[in-house]
Amino acid sequence: MATQWEVVIGLETHAQLSTVSKIFSGASTQFGAEPNTQACPVDLALPGVLPVLNRGAVERAIRFGLAIGSTIAPRSIFARKNYFYPDLPKGYQISQYEIPVVQGGQITIQVPANEKAGKAAYEKTVNLTRAHLEEDAGKSLHEDFAGMTGIDLNRAGTPLLEIVTEPEMRSAAEAVAYAKALHGLVVWLGICDGNMQEGSFRCDANVSVRPVGQEKFGTRAEIKNLNSFRFLEEAINYEVRRQIELIEDGGEVVQETRLYDPDKRETRSMRSKEDAHDYRYFPDPDLMPLVIGQDWIERVQSGMPELPAAMQQRFVDEYGVSAYDAGVLTSSKAMAAYFEAVVAKAGAANAKIAANWLMGDVSSQLNRDGIEIDAIPVSAAQLALLLQRIADGTISNKIAKEIFATIWDEKATDEGAADRIIDAKGLKQISDTGALEAIIDEVLAANAKSVEEFRAGKEKAFNALIGQAMKATKGKANPQQVNELLKKKLG
């Protein structure tokens, strides 16, 4: 019988904190500047300069810790992580080792269904070990100079929050679900812009396998700097296959650091994996211990936004939307704000139709144009009026879609755009019973065959008659009334 393998995954995520200046200097953190134009004497490790801790970076770490229910260390220390690399000017990185600022905590994830594997969607809680503050290194540019490597120190000293999980994830799907949940949270909190292309949010995956039922962990490989959710999933799946095949062929997994090649969709060895003692951590003598009083924590707490989970439950309770819909609507702070702005104008009675529109037509248009909800050309007030016109029977849902597209394309700024377009194009729904009866009589007379088929028991013929009636009114008839009148006349 073939061995059944269990996958063990832990993630280390580097979230670049959204401060204007670096963690230990006043140099700018702006992305995209000319190489080495945003590196000051502290970043360059010139003699005689000392680091000064950025208060904003600490407050962002506290905010994150409060959001995940962790313990904020009343006293934490910075350490020197010693290693040599050309883009590390000091010969060490300032980080935290023994006492991190954020200790423990957890994040609840929603793992989607996998129909191919026959797995239903489920919820899981991932425990965090810690989150600590550290500085980023510079960047080595290997492709810009023939036969040489360029060094750009603009990134050196940029504040990072390294967030470390327990090795509790058991599949690439769980790892991706966690990474997405974490990404959404740090962006929601405003502590990180989440731009993965610019390296603001990147993951290292520690992957190992072991026989099902074995308690001892297998030898792990660390896959570095995965900067997209797709790469994270592909890299983990490849690494799992590689390790299982290696063991089953009689080989041994070596503890090492690996890189993912997205073109070949495979991981490759980078270097042997170091342990903590290889870095010779010791307290940084240039930095005092970081002391965080309860009053500081309370000040940060008072400025915290409503968290996604709490808002999701509120949407279910207040607006009567499903838990799934509430989860989609709170997937970003901007989406949630837009939804609430629409409901505030359209009324709570229209909350469900507002949710359906945001997840349907609005989302598809956003995807079509490649823009985010905060750049939507249709204001919340404009959409609210449109939904009110559906609710009061002025227009049908089909006509509303046409009006929405018109407002979107013309980038209308007037709040009453929906009413203006309805009047200008004569789009009001025909709800007059007498007028509809006359139209339906004409449709029945012109479609005698469909009438016979319906009376013979063919339900499709009824739908064909509805279609003809809607066609005769150019889509402006009230569909419900058409349905009722047809049934009445057909007996």
Swiss-Prot record:
Gene3D superfamilies: 1.10.10.410, GatB domain, N-terminal subdomain. The keyword Ligase applies. Its EC number is 6.3.5.-. This is Aspartyl/glutamyl-tRNA(Asn/Gln) amidotransferase subunit B. GO terms for biological process: glutaminyl-tRNAGln biosynthesis via transamidation; translation. GO terms for molecular function: asparaginyl-tRNA synthase (glutamine-hydrolyzing) activity; ATP binding; glutaminyl-tRNA synthase (glutamine-hydrolyzing) activity. Pfam families: GatB_N, GatB_Yqey. It is an enzyme of class 6 (ligase). SUPFAM superfamilies: GatB/YqeY motif, Glutamine synthetase/guanido kinase. The keyword Aminoacyl-tRNA synthetase does not apply. It catalyses: L-glutamyl-tRNA(Gln) + L-glutamine + ATP + H2O = L-glutaminyl-tRNA(Gln) + L-glutamate + ADP + phosphate + H(+); L-aspartyl-tRNA(Asn) + L-glutamine + ATP + H2O = L-asparaginyl-tRNA(Asn) + L-glutamate + ADP + phosphate + 2 H(+). Allows the formation of correctly charged Asn-tRNA(Asn) or Gln-tRNA(Gln) through the transamidation of misacylated Asp-tRNA(Asn) or Glu-tRNA(Gln) in organisms which lack either or both of asparaginyl-tRNA or glutaminyl-tRNA synthetases. The reaction takes place in the presence of glutamine and ATP through an activated phospho-Asp-tRNA(Asn) or phospho-Glu-tRNA(Gln). The lineage of its organism: Bacteria, Pseudomonadati, Pseudomonadota, Betaproteobacteria, Burkholderiales. Keywords: ATP-binding, Ligase, Nucleotide-binding, Protein biosynthesis. Belongs to the GatB/GatE family. GatB subfamily. Heterotrimer of A, B and C subunits. The gene is gatB.
